[in-house]
Amino acid sequence: SSDLSKMKNKKCSLLSMLVASVLCVGMFAGCNNAKAPETNNKVEGQNVSSTIQKTKARTVITTDGEVDDMNSVIRFMLYANEVDLAGIVVTSSMYHYAGDEEKGIEPFRWTGTKWVDEFIDAYEEVYPNLSVHAEGYPEPEHVRNITKIGNISDAGEMDEVTEGSEYLKELFLDDDDRELYVQTWGGTNTTARALKSIEEEYKDTDKWEEIQKKINEKVVLYIILDQDDSYGEYIAKNWPSIRIINDRSNFWHFAYAWKYHNDEVNSLLQGDWMYENIKANHGPLLEKYALMGDGNYIEGELEEEQRGTEEYLKNNSEYNRYDFISEGDSPSFLYLIDNGLRSMEDPTYGGWGSRFGVVNDNLWKNTELDYNPYTNQYEASYSLTRWFDDIQNDFAARADWCVAKTYEEANHAPTVKVKEGIDLTAKAGEKITLTADAKDPDGDEITYKWWRYAEADTYEDYKGQKNETEDTYAGDLLLDTTRKLAENEVVDSIKLEGSDTNKVTFTVPEDAKSGDTIHIVVEAKDNGKINLKHYQRVI
């Protein structure tokens, strides 16, 4: 399509090669039933599902102001109660920069910085309603105070000490010992400048080793694509022990590649649903959420990237009015939401932000594949797309919160715990029983679904020779990694009995070894206007 042929433009570029590619579709794989002799479950330690008081993830956003970043900021503000927002820093990337007249650098696709202030103003208008429905939303003035301008003049520019880089430096060095997730929606250059300032201040002092240890233990960079060269040229070389979650491909499927999935995955990204449930009549913040052909025009952006215009719809007939555009950066904060999937405990576990494989002790990438029942193959992208319906329904419920002045006017997600605990030990051949207890704050009816997240297990059902993985590229951009099933390959050999009730039983395989893990997920779904879910993963 003409939309996918623009070779320089971020996240919409280099995707025309997708047309001939088979991409993943679908939602959850189900589980079958089985019977076995019953023994007692063994719980390791306390019943942590009910005793641990979890702390919110601490995070700072860095953004280059592309339209999909803007949409991600809007979604993020509806989830700002779920995390501890430490800051928003505007930065540049190879796709968006402000330019520097004195240095002869022309701006490129620069959308400015005022949009952030305008979004916070709109958030301020819906803040009273949001606060009716959940505790913990940050006060608008606080969000303003922690919003900074970083290194924006050029792609990868990290020479200048800026307000944003100094603010990141302060966060990295403060006394809060929680991990700080740096969501990298644009380039890493402002982050690199902050780290370089720390290096320049401390490298030749007796505090340097202590400072390095502090930074390495605190900072986690969640990078959505490498959008400038500052990570490779500076951070990786000078701060090799900083932990990196690098999403180089899965994000595309919640970005400009979403259209190449079928309805099993993307039905809630279509125009009719998006307009009714997100944009229309949901208050001033959601009015700013950009959809295809909605009349939105972004100053500074290229004419051919103005997706809100009639001309764009005319030239890109594969899209319908009000279709989803992109939120390629949202997986970086969806990963941080405590919805019971426990994704923050280990990037290999998987959750709303997709699933990642270990490259080394400090680096995770899109090397883990989930089985897609609709294409009958393993796909890295399915570790993200399998959650789309749940993600979108939850977003729609929070959009309703923006205009619902009373708690009773909107729907709220249930909660669920597992009586036996969330970390269990058992013997090979042992029968396990798990009991879920769900509650709904609105008094809605709750249904249960148990399923095995087999791909996250370390226990392997199939021990034969597997086929090689295949990478799909558009130009030099990785879009997906897939693997076809080998002949007679078993995907899931563990049968669940009672998978649609609050109590499930299954038998640990006889060939399970000490240290093997099996991941069982229970979903509790309400029957509100929009069906909302909460999960609990038991390992």
Where are these regions (language model features)?
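Bacterial N-terminal signal peptides that target proteins for export
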Residues: 5-18
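N-terminal acidic, glycine/proline-rich low-complexity segments
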Residues: 37-435, 439-471, 478-480, 484-492
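Short, solvent-exposed loop/turn segments at the edges of extracellular beta-sandwich modules
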Residues: 525-531
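Short beta-strand segments within Ig-like beta-sandwich modules, predominantly Fibronectin type-III
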Residues: 495-500
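C-terminal motif of bacterial Sec signal peptides marking the signal peptidase cleavage site
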Residues: 27-30
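Short, surface-exposed loop/turn segments at beta-strand-coil junctions that are enriched for proline
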Residues: 505-514, 527
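Hydrophobic beta-strand segments within extracellular beta-sandwich modules
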Residues: 518-520
